């Protein structure tokens, strides 16, 4: 990773890093895009995505980090199976694994809701008409 950063600085280029290792991503990324089933579901600065995640899939990824285990014997896992992309589901592809899913999640893909000028998330929980829920990461899931 140090070599990639050195090359990036020397050449003044950007690097796209695709990884499930959020620890590595946190150390090297300025901006983070979280993808699920081939679609970006949350995007923002690394600080925004790590310290104020808004999409339930991002919550699950963050909760699966060892730092959130707090002495537990096992890490958090997101329940269910990813959808088959041969016949993608109608609506939000994460809905069947999302314990916070709303009825509309099974009918319509959410748009990207603006949280800040640089932070967006595709979740109906950010719609002003959605019920207010407490994020498992702390704080409310609302705009």
What are these regions (language model features)?
Residues 1-73:
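P-loop NTP-binding/switch modules centered on Walker-like glycine-rich loops
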Residues 45-143:
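Short catalytic/signature loops enriched in Gly
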